[in-house]
Protein backbone atom coordinates (compact mmCIF):
# COMPACT_ATOMS: atom_id res chain seq x y z
CA UNK A 1 0.00 0.00 0.00
CA UNK A 2 1.28 3.46 -0.91
CA UNK A 3 2.15 5.93 1.76
CA UNK A 4 -0.04 8.99 2.09
CA UNK A 5 1.87 12.02 0.93
CA UNK A 6 -0.57 14.54 2.45
CA UNK A 7 -0.27 13.09 5.92
CA UNK A 8 3.53 12.81 5.84
CA UNK A 9 5.17 15.53 7.89
CA UNK A 10 8.79 14.63 7.42
CA UNK A 11 11.05 11.94 8.89
CA UNK A 12 11.22 11.76 12.64
CA UNK A 13 14.39 13.07 14.23
CA UNK A 14 16.71 11.19 16.55
CA UNK A 15 15.28 12.72 19.71
CA UNK A 16 11.85 11.26 19.02
CA UNK A 17 13.29 7.80 18.36
CA UNK A 18 15.12 7.74 21.67
CA UNK A 19 11.92 8.58 23.60
CA UNK A 20 9.66 5.67 24.50
CA UNK A 21 6.16 5.84 23.00
CA UNK A 22 3.54 7.21 25.34
CA UNK A 23 0.67 5.14 24.01
CA UNK A 24 0.25 2.44 21.36
CA UNK A 25 -2.73 0.36 20.31
CA UNK A 26 -5.20 -0.69 17.64
CA UNK A 27 -8.05 1.65 16.78
CA UNK A 28 -10.37 1.98 13.82
CA UNK A 29 -9.84 5.01 11.60
CA UNK A 30 -12.53 6.69 9.54
CA UNK A 31 -11.52 6.44 5.84
CA UNK A 32 -14.55 7.98 4.14
CA UNK A 33 -18.09 7.06 3.15
CA UNK A 34 -19.07 4.31 0.75
CA UNK A 35 -22.26 3.93 -1.22
CA UNK A 36 -24.26 2.43 1.64
CA UNK A 37 -22.20 2.94 4.80
CA UNK A 38 -19.11 4.51 6.35
CA UNK A 39 -15.70 2.93 5.85
CA UNK A 40 -13.72 2.12 9.02
CA UNK A 41 -10.33 0.39 8.87
CA UNK A 42 -8.15 -1.03 11.65
CA UNK A 43 -4.94 0.91 12.16
CA UNK A 44 -1.99 0.57 14.52
CA UNK A 45 -1.42 3.96 16.17
CA UNK A 46 1.73 5.03 18.04
CA UNK A 47 1.91 8.27 20.05
CA UNK A 48 5.50 9.37 20.57
CA UNK A 49 6.39 12.90 21.65
CA UNK A 50 4.45 15.35 19.49
CA UNK A 51 4.13 12.91 16.54
CA UNK A 52 1.30 10.48 15.81
CA UNK A 53 2.25 7.45 13.67
CA UNK A 54 -0.48 5.46 11.87
CA UNK A 55 0.23 2.17 10.03
CA UNK A 56 -1.78 -0.74 8.65
CA UNK A 57 0.09 -3.35 10.71
CA UNK A 58 2.11 -3.42 13.87
CA UNK A 59 5.66 -2.16 13.22
CA UNK A 60 8.68 -1.88 15.48
CA UNK A 61 10.21 1.12 13.74
CA UNK A 62 8.11 4.24 13.35
CA UNK A 63 9.89 5.09 10.10
CA UNK A 64 7.92 2.35 8.40
CA UNK A 65 4.56 3.97 9.28
CA UNK A 66 2.35 4.97 6.37
CA UNK A 67 1.15 8.25 7.95
CA UNK A 68 2.82 10.68 10.35
CA UNK A 69 0.90 13.62 11.83
CA UNK A 70 2.45 16.55 13.72
CA UNK A 71 0.28 17.35 16.76
CA UNK A 72 1.31 21.02 16.71
CA UNK A 73 -1.04 21.40 13.70
CA UNK A 74 -4.02 20.29 15.77
CA UNK A 75 -6.04 22.34 18.21
CA UNK A 76 -7.76 19.78 20.46
CA UNK A 77 -8.84 16.19 20.89
CA UNK A 78 -12.43 15.61 21.98
CA UNK A 79 -15.23 13.10 22.04
CA UNK A 80 -17.44 12.81 18.95
CA UNK A 81 -21.02 11.71 19.55
CA UNK A 82 -24.12 12.09 17.45
CA UNK A 83 -27.23 13.28 19.25
CA UNK A 84 -29.78 10.80 17.80
CA UNK A 85 -27.62 7.78 17.13
CA UNK A 86 -28.17 4.60 19.19
CA UNK A 87 -25.18 2.69 17.83
CA UNK A 88 -22.45 1.40 20.14
CA UNK A 89 -19.94 3.17 17.94
CA UNK A 90 -21.45 6.46 19.08
CA UNK A 91 -19.93 6.04 22.59
CA UNK A 92 -16.35 5.33 21.48
CA UNK A 93 -15.62 7.93 18.78
CA UNK A 94 -13.08 10.73 19.21
CA UNK A 95 -11.61 13.24 16.81
CA UNK A 96 -8.51 15.37 16.33
CA UNK A 97 -9.55 18.88 15.23
CA UNK A 98 -6.97 20.82 13.24
CA UNK A 99 -6.04 24.45 13.86
CA UNK A 100 -8.11 27.01 12.01
CA UNK A 101 -5.12 28.97 10.84
CA UNK A 102 -4.65 29.79 7.16
CA UNK A 103 -2.18 27.50 5.42
CA UNK A 104 -2.82 24.45 7.62
CA UNK A 105 -3.03 21.31 5.45
CA UNK A 106 -3.48 18.73 8.23
CA UNK A 107 -6.76 16.78 7.92
CA UNK A 108 -9.32 16.21 10.64
CA UNK A 109 -8.92 12.69 12.04
CA UNK A 110 -11.73 10.52 13.42
CA UNK A 111 -11.03 7.33 15.36
CA UNK A 112 -13.15 4.59 16.93
CA UNK A 113 -11.77 3.00 20.08
CA UNK A 114 -12.47 -0.51 21.32
CA UNK A 115 -14.35 0.70 24.42
CA UNK A 116 -15.38 3.99 26.06
CA UNK A 117 -12.56 3.55 28.61
CA UNK A 118 -10.00 3.20 25.83
CA UNK A 119 -11.51 6.27 24.18
CA UNK A 120 -10.99 8.35 27.36
CA UNK A 121 -7.41 7.13 27.61
CA UNK A 122 -6.62 8.17 24.02
CA UNK A 123 -8.29 11.58 24.52
CA UNK A 124 -6.22 12.32 27.64
CA UNK A 125 -2.95 11.21 26.03
CA UNK A 126 -3.53 13.15 22.81
CA UNK A 127 -4.62 16.32 24.69
CA UNK A 128 -1.43 16.26 26.79
CA UNK A 129 0.68 15.75 23.67
CA UNK A 130 -1.02 18.68 21.89
CA UNK A 131 -0.36 20.94 24.89
CA UNK A 132 3.31 19.96 24.97
CA UNK A 133 3.63 20.58 21.24
CA UNK A 134 2.19 24.09 21.60
CA UNK A 135 4.51 24.86 24.53
CA UNK A 136 7.51 23.50 22.63
CA UNK A 137 6.93 26.04 19.89
CA UNK A 138 6.85 28.83 22.47
CA UNK A 139 9.96 27.53 24.26
CA UNK A 140 11.96 27.58 21.03
CA UNK A 141 11.53 31.37 20.74
CA UNK A 142 14.82 33.04 21.72
CA UNK A 143 15.59 36.71 22.16
CA UNK A 144 19.00 38.02 21.19
CA UNK A 145 20.83 40.54 23.33
CA UNK A 146 21.04 43.00 20.46
CA UNK A 147 17.26 43.14 20.19
CA UNK A 148 16.74 44.38 23.76
CA UNK A 149 14.93 47.70 24.05
CA UNK A 150 17.13 50.51 25.26
CA UNK A 151 15.86 52.19 28.42
CA UNK A 152 15.33 55.87 27.52
CA UNK A 153 15.83 57.34 31.02
CA UNK A 154 18.07 54.85 32.84
CA UNK A 155 21.35 56.57 31.97
CA UNK A 156 20.00 60.10 32.11
CA UNK A 157 21.78 62.53 34.45
CA UNK A 158 19.87 63.12 37.67
CA UNK A 159 19.00 66.73 38.53
CA UNK A 160 18.61 67.88 42.12
CA UNK A 161 15.12 69.40 42.45
CA UNK A 162 14.75 71.97 45.24
CA UNK A 163 11.52 72.18 47.19
CA UNK A 164 9.37 75.19 46.43
CA UNK A 165 7.54 77.06 49.22
CA UNK A 166 3.79 76.40 49.47
CA UNK A 167 1.55 78.77 47.56
CA UNK A 168 -1.33 80.77 48.95
CA UNK A 169 -3.90 78.51 47.29
CA UNK A 170 -2.33 75.46 48.92
CA UNK A 171 -2.41 77.11 52.36
CA UNK A 172 -6.07 78.08 51.95
CA UNK A 173 -6.98 74.54 50.89
CA UNK A 174 -5.20 73.05 53.90
CA UNK A 175 -6.84 75.58 56.25
CA UNK A 176 -10.33 74.87 54.85
CA UNK A 177 -9.95 71.10 55.36
CA UNK A 178 -8.46 71.38 58.85
CA UNK A 179 -10.38 70.25 61.92
CA UNK A 180 -12.13 72.63 64.33
CA UNK A 181 -9.63 72.15 67.16
CA UNK A 182 -6.82 73.50 65.00
CA UNK A 183 -4.27 70.75 65.63
CA UNK A 184 -3.27 70.40 61.97
CA UNK A 185 0.35 71.44 61.44
CA UNK A 186 1.19 73.58 58.43
CA UNK A 187 4.53 72.71 56.90
CA UNK A 188 6.25 76.05 56.37
CA UNK A 189 9.81 74.77 55.98
CA UNK A 190 11.91 76.48 53.35
CA UNK A 191 15.00 75.07 51.74
CA UNK A 192 18.37 75.72 53.36
CA UNK A 193 19.85 76.90 50.07
CA UNK A 194 17.32 79.21 48.38
CA UNK A 195 17.71 80.29 44.82
CA UNK A 196 20.39 82.97 44.39
CA UNK A 197 17.95 85.20 42.54
CA UNK A 198 16.27 87.58 45.04
CA UNK A 199 15.94 85.35 48.15
CA UNK A 200 14.79 88.24 50.39
CA UNK A 201 11.83 89.14 48.15
CA UNK A 202 10.71 85.49 48.03
CA UNK A 203 10.77 85.21 51.85
CA UNK A 204 8.89 88.49 52.28
CA UNK A 205 6.13 87.48 49.83
CA UNK A 206 5.84 84.11 51.58
CA UNK A 207 5.43 85.80 54.99
CA UNK A 208 2.76 88.15 53.59
CA UNK A 209 0.79 85.22 52.16
CA UNK A 210 1.06 83.38 55.48
CA UNK A 211 -0.20 86.41 57.46
CA UNK A 212 -3.20 86.82 55.17
CA UNK A 213 -4.15 83.14 55.33
CA UNK A 214 -3.84 83.02 59.14
CA UNK A 215 -5.93 86.19 59.56
CA UNK A 216 -8.68 84.79 57.32
CA UNK A 217 -8.65 81.47 59.17
CA UNK A 218 -8.88 83.20 62.59
CA UNK A 219 -11.77 85.39 61.42
CA UNK A 220 -13.72 82.35 60.18
CA UNK A 221 -13.14 80.58 63.52
CA UNK A 222 -14.41 83.62 65.49
CA UNK A 223 -17.52 83.81 63.32
CA UNK A 224 -18.15 80.10 63.92
CA UNK A 225 -17.78 80.59 67.71
CA UNK A 226 -20.21 83.52 67.73
CA UNK A 227 -22.70 81.48 65.70
CA UNK A 228 -22.52 78.69 68.28
CA UNK A 229 -23.04 81.09 71.22
CA UNK A 230 -26.01 82.87 69.61
CA UNK A 231 -28.45 79.89 69.46
CA UNK A 232 -27.61 78.84 73.02
CA UNK A 233 -28.32 82.35 74.38
CA UNK A 234 -31.55 82.51 72.37
CA UNK A 235 -32.55 79.17 73.82
CA UNK A 236 -31.81 80.34 77.37
CA UNK A 237 -33.80 83.54 76.89
CA UNK A 238 -36.81 81.58 75.61
CA UNK A 239 -37.07 79.75 78.97
CA UNK A 240 -39.53 81.59 81.23
CA UNK A 241 -38.01 82.33 84.66
CA UNK A 242 -39.42 84.88 87.12
CA UNK A 243 -36.02 85.73 88.62
CA UNK A 244 -34.22 86.35 85.34
CA UNK A 245 -32.99 89.86 84.42
CA UNK A 246 -31.78 89.87 80.82
CA UNK A 247 -31.46 93.67 80.72
CA UNK A 248 -28.21 93.60 82.73
CA UNK A 249 -26.26 91.53 80.21
CA UNK A 250 -23.29 92.84 78.27
CA UNK A 251 -22.84 91.72 74.63
CA UNK A 252 -19.86 89.55 73.76
CA UNK A 253 -17.36 91.45 71.63
CA UNK A 254 -14.56 89.32 70.17
CA UNK A 255 -11.19 90.98 70.04
CA UNK A 256 -9.24 91.44 66.85
CA UNK A 257 -6.38 89.05 66.23
CA UNK A 258 -3.00 90.42 67.24
CA UNK A 259 -0.59 90.00 64.38
CA UNK A 260 2.71 88.42 65.37
CA UNK A 261 5.95 90.15 64.38
CA UNK A 262 8.05 88.51 61.71
CA UNK A 263 10.92 87.86 64.15
CA UNK A 264 8.78 85.61 66.36
CA UNK A 265 7.51 83.39 63.57
CA UNK A 266 9.07 79.94 63.51
CA UNK A 267 9.78 78.02 60.37
CA UNK A 268 7.33 75.27 61.33
CA UNK A 269 4.24 76.48 63.20
CA UNK A 270 0.91 74.86 63.99
CA UNK A 271 -2.56 76.34 63.95
CA UNK A 272 -2.80 75.78 67.72
CA UNK A 273 0.20 78.09 68.32
CA UNK A 274 -0.98 80.71 65.82
CA UNK A 275 -4.50 80.95 67.25
CA UNK A 276 -3.42 80.81 70.91
CA UNK A 277 -3.49 84.62 71.03
CA UNK A 278 -7.29 84.58 70.70
CA UNK A 279 -7.65 82.41 73.81
CA UNK A 280 -5.47 84.75 75.94
CA UNK A 281 -7.16 87.96 74.72
CA UNK A 282 -9.56 89.62 77.24
CA UNK A 283 -13.20 88.83 76.60
CA UNK A 284 -16.41 90.09 78.18
CA UNK A 285 -18.86 87.19 78.45
CA UNK A 286 -22.55 87.66 79.00
CA UNK A 287 -23.56 87.71 82.71
CA UNK A 288 -27.17 87.07 83.69
CA UNK A 289 -27.71 87.85 87.38
CA UNK A 290 -30.41 85.92 89.22
CA UNK A 291 -31.92 86.40 92.64
CA UNK A 292 -31.90 82.69 93.30
CA UNK A 293 -30.08 79.82 91.60
CA UNK A 294 -31.74 76.49 92.49
CA UNK A 295 -29.09 74.28 90.86
CA UNK A 296 -26.09 74.68 88.51
CA UNK A 297 -26.29 73.62 84.90
CA UNK A 298 -25.31 69.97 84.70
CA UNK A 299 -22.44 69.15 82.46
CA UNK A 300 -22.27 65.50 83.42
CA UNK A 301 -24.85 62.76 84.11
CA UNK A 302 -23.67 62.65 87.77
CA UNK A 303 -24.76 66.25 88.42
CA UNK A 304 -28.14 65.59 86.81
CA UNK A 305 -28.67 62.60 89.10
CA UNK A 306 -27.85 64.76 92.16
CA UNK A 307 -30.40 67.35 91.09
CA UNK A 308 -33.01 64.64 90.66
CA UNK A 309 -32.26 63.38 94.19
CA UNK A 310 -32.68 66.91 95.55
CA UNK A 311 -36.06 67.26 93.85
CA UNK A 312 -37.14 63.87 95.21
CA UNK A 313 -36.21 64.93 98.76
CA UNK A 314 -38.19 68.16 98.34
CA UNK A 315 -41.20 66.15 97.24
CA UNK A 316 -40.90 63.80 100.22
CA UNK A 317 -40.71 66.76 102.59
CA UNK A 318 -43.80 68.30 101.02
CA UNK A 319 -45.72 65.05 101.39
CA UNK A 320 -44.71 64.83 105.06
CA UNK A 321 -45.94 68.38 105.67
CA UNK A 322 -49.25 67.61 103.99
CA UNK A 323 -49.67 64.45 106.06
CA UNK A 324 -48.87 66.36 109.25
CA UNK A 325 -51.37 69.10 108.47
CA UNK A 326 -54.04 66.55 107.60
CA UNK A 327 -53.40 64.67 110.85
CA UNK A 328 -53.65 67.86 112.91
CA UNK A 329 -56.92 68.80 111.26
CA UNK A 330 -58.45 65.37 111.81
CA UNK A 331 -57.37 65.35 115.49
CA UNK A 332 -58.87 68.76 116.17
CA UNK A 333 -62.19 68.23 114.45
CA UNK A 334 -62.76 64.72 115.84
CA UNK A 335 -62.41 65.68 119.51
CA UNK A 336 -65.10 64.11 121.70
CA UNK A 337 -65.38 66.98 124.23
CA UNK A 338 -67.28 69.94 122.71
CA UNK A 339 -66.44 72.45 125.49
CA UNK A 340 -62.67 71.79 124.96
CA UNK A 341 -62.75 72.57 121.21
CA UNK A 342 -60.50 75.45 120.16
CA UNK A 343 -62.05 78.88 119.71
CA UNK A 344 -62.73 80.40 116.33
CA UNK A 345 -59.52 82.43 116.36
CA UNK A 346 -57.37 79.34 116.85
CA UNK A 347 -59.21 77.46 114.09
CA UNK A 348 -58.71 80.38 111.74
CA UNK A 349 -55.00 80.50 112.57
CA UNK A 350 -54.76 76.77 111.97
CA UNK A 351 -56.49 77.14 108.61
CA UNK A 352 -54.20 80.00 107.64
CA UNK A 353 -51.14 77.99 108.65
CA UNK A 354 -52.44 75.05 106.66
CA UNK A 355 -53.04 77.21 103.61
CA UNK A 356 -49.58 78.69 103.92
CA UNK A 357 -47.97 75.26 104.17
CA UNK A 358 -49.99 74.03 101.22
CA UNK A 359 -49.00 77.09 99.20
CA UNK A 360 -45.33 76.59 100.01
CA UNK A 361 -45.59 72.91 99.15
CA UNK A 362 -47.31 73.62 95.83
CA UNK A 363 -44.81 76.38 94.99
CA UNK A 364 -41.90 74.07 95.86
CA UNK A 365 -43.47 71.33 93.77
CA UNK A 366 -43.98 73.57 90.73
CA UNK A 367 -40.54 75.12 91.10
CA UNK A 368 -38.90 71.71 91.35
CA UNK A 369 -40.74 70.47 88.27
CA UNK A 370 -39.81 73.64 86.38
CA UNK A 371 -36.16 73.33 87.36
CA UNK A 372 -36.07 69.67 86.36
CA UNK A 373 -37.67 70.46 83.00
CA UNK A 374 -35.19 73.26 82.37
CA UNK A 375 -32.31 71.01 83.31
CA UNK A 376 -33.50 68.38 80.85
CA UNK A 377 -33.89 70.96 78.09
CA UNK A 378 -30.43 72.34 78.75
CA UNK A 379 -28.99 68.84 78.76
CA UNK A 380 -30.57 68.12 75.37
CA UNK A 381 -29.31 71.46 74.07
CA UNK A 382 -25.73 70.77 75.17
CA UNK A 383 -25.89 67.28 73.73
CA UNK A 384 -26.87 68.72 70.36
CA UNK A 385 -24.05 71.24 70.59
CA UNK A 386 -21.58 68.49 71.50
CA UNK A 387 -22.69 66.39 68.55
CA UNK A 388 -22.25 69.34 66.19
CA UNK A 389 -18.90 70.47 67.59
CA UNK A 390 -17.35 67.60 69.60
CA UNK A 391 -13.82 68.94 69.38
CA UNK A 392 -14.44 72.62 70.19
CA UNK A 393 -16.63 71.92 73.26
CA UNK A 394 -13.66 71.32 75.55
CA UNK A 395 -11.92 74.51 74.48
CA UNK A 396 -15.01 76.65 75.09
CA UNK A 397 -15.73 75.21 78.54
CA UNK A 398 -13.31 77.53 80.34
CA UNK A 399 -14.53 80.61 78.43
CA UNK A 400 -18.27 80.11 78.99
CA UNK A 401 -18.34 78.52 82.45
CA UNK A 402 -19.74 81.67 84.09
CA UNK A 403 -22.33 82.05 81.33
CA UNK A 404 -23.61 78.48 81.81
CA UNK A 405 -23.80 78.91 85.60
CA UNK A 406 -25.81 82.12 85.27
CA UNK A 407 -28.49 80.42 83.13
CA UNK A 408 -30.07 78.93 86.27
Curated annotation (Swiss-Prot):
Q: Which residues carry this modification: Phosphoserine?
A: 226, 270, 341
What is the superkingdom listed in this entry's lineage?
Eukaryota
Bias class Polar residues marks the residues at 389-401
Annotated region Disordered: where?
1-20, 217-265, 389-408
Q: Where is this region: Negative regulator of AP-1 activity?
A: 307-408
The membrane topology noted for this protein in its Swiss-Prot or TrEMBL record is: Peripheral membrane protein
Looking at the UniProt record, the site noted as Interacts with capping protein sits at 154, 156
Could you state what the record's PTM comment says about this protein? C-terminal fragments could be released during apoptosis via caspase-3-dependent cleavage.
Could you mention a single GO BP entry for this protein? myoblast fusion
Where does this protein have coiled-coil stretches?
Answer: none
Region entry Interaction with capping proteins (CPs), spans = 132-192
List where in the cell it is found.
Answer: Cell membrane; Nucleus; Cytoplasm
* Keyword terms: Cell membrane, Cytoplasm, Membrane, Nucleus, Phosphoprotein, Tumor suppressor
Gene3D superfamilies associated with the record: Pleckstrin-homology domain (PH domain)/Phosphotyrosine-binding domain (PTB) (2.30.29.30)
Keyword Membrane in annotation? yes
Annotated site residues (Cleavage) in this chain: 309-310, 344-345
Provide the PH domain boundaries. Answer: 20-131
Q: Name one GO cellular component term.
A: muscle cell projection membrane
Pfam families to which the protein is assigned, alphabetical: PH
| Main subcellular localisation | membrane
PROSITE patterns attached here? Answer: PH_DOMAIN
The entry describes its oligomerization and partners as: Heterodimer or homodimer. Interacts with CK2 and actin capping subunits (capping protein CP-alpha and CP-beta). CKIP1 and CK2 together inhibit the activity of actin capping protein at the barbed ends of actin filaments. Interacts with ATM, IFP35, JUN, JUND, NMI and PI3K. Interacts with AKT1, AKT2 and AKT3 (each isozyme of PKB), PtdIns(3,5)P2, PtdIns(4,5)P2 and PtdIns(3,4,5)P2.
**What's this protein's function?**
Plays a role in the regulation of the actin cytoskeleton through its interactions with actin capping protein (CP). May function to target CK2 to the plasma membrane thereby serving as an adapter to facilitate the phosphorylation of CP by protein kinase 2 (CK2). Appears to target ATM to the plasma membrane. Also implicated in PI3K-regulated muscle differentiation, the regulation of AP-1 activity (plasma membrane bound AP-1 regulator that translocates to the nucleus) and the promotion of apoptosis induced by tumor necrosis factor TNF.
Spell out the protein name for this chain.
Pleckstrin homology domain-containing family O member 1
Species of provenance: Rattus norvegicus
Amino acid sequence: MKKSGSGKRGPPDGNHQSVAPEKVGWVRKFCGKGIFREIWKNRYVVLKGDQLYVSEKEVKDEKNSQEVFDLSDYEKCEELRKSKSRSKKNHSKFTLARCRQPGTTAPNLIFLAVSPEEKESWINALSSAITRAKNRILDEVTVEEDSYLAHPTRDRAKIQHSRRPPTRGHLMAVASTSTSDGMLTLDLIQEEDPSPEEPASCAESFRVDLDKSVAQLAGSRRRADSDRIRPSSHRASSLSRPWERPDKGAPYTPQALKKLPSTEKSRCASLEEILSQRDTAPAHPLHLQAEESPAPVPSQPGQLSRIQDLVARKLEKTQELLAEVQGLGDGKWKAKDPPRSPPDSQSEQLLLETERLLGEASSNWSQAKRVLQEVRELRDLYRQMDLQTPDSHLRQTSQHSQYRKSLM
